[in-house]
Amino acid sequence: MRLSLFLSGLAAAGSIVSAERTCGAVPPRGYEKEFSEAFAALGPEATSDLTAGITIDTYLHVLTSGTTGNIPDSQLQAQINAMNQHYGPSGVQFRLVKATRTNNANWASGRDEAGMKSALHMGTYSSLNIYFIPNLSSGLLGICYFPRANPSQTTITMDGCMVRSGTVPGGETTNYNQGKTATHEVGHFLGLYHVFSENGSCVDADMVADTPPQSKKTSGCPNSQDSCPGGGVDSIHNYMDYSYDVCMNQFTRGQASRIAQAWQAFRAGH
């Protein structure tokens, strides 16, 4: 996750063929302590409700520069359908409340994130805003913000995910056009880390017991990968790895539990 967070206009979504998935999400310093304390502060009623389903009001924002980056309604609905399919077994569903389209070359080039979000962000801290941007810098496919305790108005406004436009179902980003980039980024919105270690070690990098230790990100779609022998094969099919879209098909029960905990601790009721 230690990747550049600077966004700049490099090329249109359809003109970049990504060699591998890249995500700019970085957990805040001391985040796991914040997570544990926020969850511990919940009352018995909240912690007993972890098996209840979660429905998230969702706002999709399409940023264009002229015709570059436009996404038709059919593909936006396909993105919501894909996310509902991917998260359904974990008890999470997304309800599309509104889609917006804004023709602004500056925002479509990934510049002025604060200005863009101040103008476009909708809903509350329990709402999901996804900004589809044709030009994310340095080959990034997406970036999203982790949930925080006691969010300020600025934190609420800056919340949400920025996703490359060409990664929606049927999009133009080769190997990453089944809508799973948004699924991956929303995982961070719901408190999930990457399944692999960021420093090449075989530690429990994602704080989830049923994802085996993994010392490196996955590239492509290998038949198998075992970067930490003895702990189980790598989670190459997990949405929180870096595999091709065709390779991704699962969250674990442990990840579903962490999502429920993060939702109750950070977003429910906000």
Swiss-Prot record:
UniProt keywords, alphabetically: Disulfide bond, Glycoprotein, Hydrolase, Metal-binding, Metalloprotease, Protease, Secreted, Signal, Virulence, Zinc
Glycosylation sites per record: 135, 199
Organism: Arthroderma otae (strain ATCC MYA-4605 / CBS 113480)
Disulfide bridge positions per record: 221-247
A biological process from GO: proteolysis
Cited SUPFAM superfamilies: Metalloproteases ('zincins'), catalytic domain
UniProt-recorded name of the protein: Extracellular metalloprotease MCYG_04966
Protein localization: Secreted
Any one Gene Ontology molecular-function term assigned to this protein's record: metal ion binding
Biased composition range(s): Polar residues: 212-227
Keyword Manganese part of the UniProt annotation: no
EC class of the enzyme, as a word: hydrolase
EC number: 3.4.24.-
UniProt-annotated catalytic positions: 185
GO cellular component, as recorded: extracellular region
One Pfam family matching this protein: Peptidase_M43
Signal peptide extent: 1-19
Function: Secreted metalloproteinase that allows assimilation of proteinaceous substrates. Plays a pivotal role as a pathogenicity determinant during infections and contributes to the ability of the pathogen to persist within the mammalian host.
Residues the record lists as binding Zn(2+): 184, 188
Primary location class: secreted
Family note: Belongs to the peptidase M43B family.
